[in-house]
Amino acid sequence: MCIRLLLGYRQLGKAGFLQAALKNLDFLWTGWDDELGGGIYWYKDRSSKNACSNAPAAIAFLLAYQCTGNEEYLEKGKLIYDWMNGALRENDLFADNIVVETGAKNHWKGIYNQATMIYAGSLLYEITGDETYYDLTRRTVNATLELMFREEQTADGAAEIRMNGNPIFKAWCVGWLARSYVKFYETDPAKDTKPMDMLKGVLDRELLTRTEDGLYDPFFCSGQSDPDNVSELLAQDGVASAFLCAAYYNVFLR
C-alpha cells in the first residue's frame, strides 16, 4: 500500500497520498527489532522475518525519502536492504524467510523477493550513486535470468524463451519482475537489454494465450496450471502490469 501511495503522490501530487503513506510507514517500522541483527517481522506473532516483508519495506522507505528528502527514511531503507543482504542473500538470490527462534531458513527463491530487491537496489543506486548497490543489484538480475528463464527449440528449430514455473508463485510476481527490470534498466550505466529481452520473449508467447473472455495464462506458459487462478483479478493484474512495463520500455526507454 505504501509503495502505491507514494508512486501515486509522485504522479498526481495529492498530499493525502503522501500523508497516508508516511503514517503507514510509522506503523511498519514497529515491526523492526534487533533479533537476528535486524529485519521486519512478517506477522504479528513475530515468529519469522521474511523477504516479502522487508524488501518492499525498503522500497517504501526509499520512495518516501525521494518524496520528502527526509534522511531518516533513507537510513531506514538502507538498514533494511543491508539486513536482507546479510541475512537472506544466497548466491545472489534471496531466501524466503528466517525463523527467529531457531535461525532456520526457508531456502525457496520466489521471484517476488528477487524482484523487489532488484527494485530496492536500483533505487539506492539512483539515490546515492554508490557502485556497491549497482554491483549487488546487477548480480541479482543476472541470477534471476538463470532462475526464471530457459531457452528451448520449437519443432522448426527456432529459439523460444520460456519461464520456469516454480519461482513464479503468482502472476503478480512476474508483474513485479517486469517493474524491477525496467527500474534496473533506467539506472544501469551499461544499459543491458538482456533482462527485458528475455521477458519480452515470454510476453510475446503470453499474448497467444488470450481467451474469449480476455484472460491470459497466469503462469506465463511455464507449464504450471491452476484453473481457479485464471480468473483471479490479482493474476490478470500481474499479466497487465508486465505488458505495460514492456510497452513503457519499448516506447520511452529504447
Specify the residue positions occupied by each region the protein language model found.
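Eukaryotic tandem repeat interaction scaffolds
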Residues: 104-153
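Extended ligand-binding groove/face enriched in aromatic
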Residues: 1-67, 71, 75-78
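Active-site cradle of extracellular carbohydrate-active enzymes
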Residues: 54-57, 61-65, 73-124
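Acidic/His metal-coordination segments adjacent to aromatic residues that form catalytic metal sites
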Residues: 40-43, 96-104, 149-164
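CBM-like carbohydrate-recognition segments
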Residues: 8, 49, 132, 139, ...
